[in-house]
Design a protein with these regions (language model features):
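Vicinal oxygen chelate
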Residues: 1-16, 32-85, 91-120, 131-135
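Amphipathic alpha-helical segments
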Residues: 21-36
Length: 135
């Protein structure tokens, strides 16, 4: 794994996903092409995993973190939606379905010219996978 600061720090911004099981959630995003570049602690059960896909970054963090750091409780509802572009929407949905992911909406060509499907990450957050329409 690389150092966490490959870019100048002032140029970085990324979403943080609060997860009940950090490693399981990271595996879901790794199936979408993200690569693990940082983990704390480095060995054992992680409380933080940094992922990259090209210039995009995401952090998967234990849902206990906000309460420990600033006394806020992470709720159980949808906390965000991730939108991820892939080379082949249908193939990606099939692979994630086979690995146990829940498909919320089957792939469909949208009016704005993309093919989009929605899945649920391991904590129930919606994740759109999008790409070119089927020709």
């Amino acid at each position: 794994m690389s150092r966490p600061y490959a870019l100048p720090i002032a140029e970085r911004a990324f979403p943080v996903v609060f997860a009940t099981h950090v490693a399981r959630s990271a595996s879901f995003y790794e199936a979408l092409g993200f690569e693990r570049h940082f983990q704390l602690p480095p060995e054992g059960e992680p409380g933080y995993i940094g992922l990259r896909r090209g210039a995009s970054e995401i952090a998967i963090v234990s849902a206990d973190w906000p309460e420990q750091q600033y006394r806020l409780h992470v709720g159980k509802g949808v906390r965000f939606e991730m939108f991820v572009y892939v080379d082949n929407v249908d193939r990606t949905v099939s692979q994630l379905r086979a690995s146990g992911s829940t498909v919320l909406r089957e792939p469909a060509d949208m009016a704005w010219g993309e093919r989009v499907a929605y899945l649920s990450d391991p904590d129930g957050n919606p994740v759109a996978v999008a790409g070119r329409p089927v020709e």
